[in-house]
Amino acid sequence: MGKFGGIILILILLMWCCNTRKTVVEFNLIGSSGIQPELVVNGEEREIEVDDSGYAKLMLTEGEHGYATLKYGKDRLPLFIEDGTTLRIYIYGDHAKGNIRFEGDGSPKNSYLNSQVMKNLSFDYELNAPEFLDQLKDLIQEQFHYLDTMGFDAAFAEMERNRIKFSTYKALENYPLYHAWSTGNMDYQPDTAYLSCIKKLIKEDEKLLVLKEYQEGMASLVSLISTYHMKELDAYKQVMAQFDYVIHHLTNETLVEFLIDHYAYAYLLGVGIDEHIDDVLRVYDFYVKDPALRKRFQEIYDRCAKIVPGSPAFDFMFTDIAGQAVELEDFRGKYLFINVWTTWGVPCRYENLAWEKLEKEFEDENIVFVAVSCDNDRAVWEKRVRENPKGEVQLYMGSDRSFMDFYMIRGIRRS
């Protein structure tokens, strides 16, 4: 190649580099008290370091695009990051929901995903099964109609249709229990027509696994169809029924691996390391080979190992109604029954009756019943305790959630 040929080649390469568009996400936090946003793309979590003015610029690499999640404090917002686009995100205050704005060529799809039309889905669980199914169809069609008005490209629109469907399908798993509660018919069981509809909705499509809604929707549908006949709540029987359905009715290896991991992980979170864990691990080890999934599972297994019976208790320090510190050492020589609750939790209020019966049953034993509130507002907790004095020890956790983290308490109430 001659001298001029080499120069032309260099110029072509320079022009190609200049024309290759970067994928950029900019963050502008206005009025924030120091919350650090996090971006989850393709399952990978990235912390965003903003400067003193609340600004951060993130250059994404090839492959870091598609559906994503923005974590901001307790808020979780959907994003769609398009290759070669710039997305500018403005968040006002410490709560992103309802206080977020988008600019740049990546703005339209993200504004759509975070619009009110795509959020406020409510379900009437008192409806009978056919009516409930019709309600879901109407909600899906309503969202489809809104999507069609946006004029997005065909590929995104098709993926969105699947995301909408499986997001809405999640309500199907809740229906039997919520219908029983709302109607007072605690013996309710879904009929064959309802179950037949569920089976038709189970769709194996590996390319949809990039959608969190597809993952959750499929997990819900398979869980419902595999455990509907169980009248008692037995976590071990439930997870083995879920495994059995996945193994004998699904064929896509990637989907099978995902669902086995999903159910085993949920079992570990809910039950911990118990006498049945070896059975769960045998199935898990046979079907789950993905290193990332196994790493995540091992991490939660190691955490569960710290709280098996006989392990040292968490050395907590909370405060009582008078503001005095109360710590684990104060109960040396006693058995503790600790209940984590909040004043606003409806299940907490309903279960108080069972809690009081338990107290009475063991009132002559060497057991101390301790109710620990994780309310954000101490004044609200104090008001409730003073208005409804109970026999148990009442403590306030405050903002430190290390106790809940240690015992992996994700929902309340939890004892």
Feature locations, PLM:
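Conserved redox-active cysteine motifs that mediate thiol-disulfide chemistry
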Residues: 332, 340-357
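Alpha-helical repeat scaffolds
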Residues: 182-199, 236-247, 274-285, 314-315
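Thiol-based oxidoreductase modules, predominantly thioredoxin-like and allied folds used
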Residues: 365-380, 389-401
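Thiol/disulfide oxidoreductase modules built on the thioredoxin-like
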Residues: 390, 398-415
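Bacterial Sec-dependent N-terminal signal peptides
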Residues: 1-26
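N-terminal "domain-start" segment that seeds a small globular fold
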Residues: 295-328, 390
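A non-transmembrane, solvent-exposed segment enriched in polar/low-complexity residues
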Residues: 18-159, 163-166, 170-189
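Long, charge-rich alpha-helical interaction segments
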Residues: 208, 213-274, 296
